[in-house]
Swiss-Prot record:
Binds 2 manganese ions per subunit. This is DNA double-strand break repair protein Mre11. Keywords: DNA damage, DNA repair, Endonuclease, Exonuclease, Hydrolase, Manganese, Metal-binding, Nuclease. Its EC number is 3.1.-.-. The lineage of its organism: Archaea, Methanobacteriati, Thermoplasmatota, Thermoplasmata, Thermoplasmatales. The active site is at residue 82.
């Protein structure tokens, strides 16, 4: 079984229920592995939400490992950007090595070979490499391609953003950089499930819980889940199993007059089977309304829980008669400051001529003036 980005130990500043949600999803994934009698489990990074997890997170992981170990099911893990140890730190998962936990690829590509059902399986791993380590990543991919080519069943574990699965300028590598002589490339880091056959089958298993509102659309389309992967004689088949314990989430963006109605509409249209958890609502309101009023309104919903609402008080555009006003008057009325109005006019002039240096000089002058005006 391949799963990823469990982020156990994650804690919300406002909702105690959220920490338990991540444990629930993690344990459901482990139960799926047991129910399907898998030979081994791989986890592709961000097992914990931080590299120094709390006692409860470690205990929950230990309990899961004990269930796997009782069935002689090893688990192979790599580090993500959240749980990668800093400098000389020790990995939390590594303390359970005596119970079948194998940490791979801390600082470089590393692999292990195990025999399952009479077939050798090479399991290799490269933990997250970004920042100053990014330049080494492509070299490690190449090194993995040149090691022990005799094995037909080859799995690579990696925790990176790969172009074209993510925004190119935020990726550490491109698909062409990946080694092509693996049977299955198990990815972590991106929280939505994705798969593509590029020679080897490559798949992001996705996260097991919704950690960001950016994941809600993906969750509504395909849920959260784990990959049950059958690999034999170099051939790979993937079965996706959805998790049922994931707390449903919706996002409501509305104005001060309509947000209550829109919350009701979205909650009534939400259909999630086999899940008794109350949906989590992320709310953003545009307009002039007090937080106290909003909190009173949402407290009336006993069928949902809410993260802290966001109130965006949209700026009021000054009403100036166009026939008598020039552009500088607009800037002065809107910004409320003569110097800022002058700066806006100068920046606009530089922008028209694409004079970036001129823009920066104007800002530096203003910054210097503000420093002189500020008290020590």
């Amino acid at each position: 079984m391949h799963f990823s980005d469990t982020h156990i130990g994650y804690r919300s500043l406002t909702l105690d229920e959220r920490e338990q949600d991540f444990y629930d999803a993690f344990h459901e994934a482990i139960d799926i592995a047991l129910e399907n009698s898998v030979d081994f489990v791989i986890h592709t990074g961000d097992l914990f939400d931080t590299w120094v997890p709390g006692n409860r997170a470690i205990r929950e992981f230990r309990n899961a490992v004990m269930k796997l170990n009782a069935r002689n099911i090893p688990i192979f893990v790599i580090f993500g950007d959240h749980d990668r140890p800093r400098r000389n730190g020790e990995p939390a998962a590594g303390i359970f090595d005596f119970m079948g936990v194998h940490v791979l690829g801390w600082d470089a590509y590393e692999y292990a070979v195990r025999k399952f059902d009479g077939e050798d399986v090479l399991i290799g791993g490269i933990s997250n490499m970004k920042g100053y380590m990014k330049t080494r990543l492509k070299d490690e991919y190449k090194r993995s391609e040149n090691i022990e080519e005799g094995y037909r069943n080859r799995i690579l574990m990696s925790h990176q953003a790969i172009d074209p699965f993510f925004v190119p300028d935020q990726c550490e590598a491109k698909m062409d950089d990946l080694p092509m002589n693996f049977s299955y490339i198990a990815m972590g880091h991106l929280h939505d499930f994705m798969e593509r056959r590029i020679g080897p089958l490559i798949s992001y298993a996705g996260s097991t819980e919704i950690k960001s509102e950016n994941e809600i659309n993906g969750y509504l389309k395909q849920g959260k889940g784990v990959n049950i992967v059958d690999i034999s004689n170099g051939e790979v088949d993937l079965q996706r199993i959805r998790l049922k314990s994931v707390r449903p989430q919706i996002r409501v963006e509305s104005d001060a007059d309509n947000y209550v109605h829109e919350i009701s509409e979205k909650l009534s249209s939400l259909r999630v089977k086999d899940n008794e958890k109350k949906p989590l609502v992320g709310l953003e309101i545009h307009g002039d309304i007090s937080m106290e009023t909003v909190m009173q309104d949402i407290s009336k919903f006993d069928n949902a829980i809410f993260s802290r609402p966001k109130i965006r008080k949209d700026p009021k555009i000054p009403n100036i008669h166009t026939e008598t006003a020039d552009l500088r008057e607009y800037f002065r009325a809107y910004l409320g400051d003569e110097r800022l109005a002058d700066l806006a006019m100068k920046i606009m002039a530089h922008s028209r001529s694409k004079d970036i240096d001129g823009i920066m000089k104007e800002i530096e002058v203003l910054y210097g003036d503000n420093r002189q005006d500020s008290p020590d």
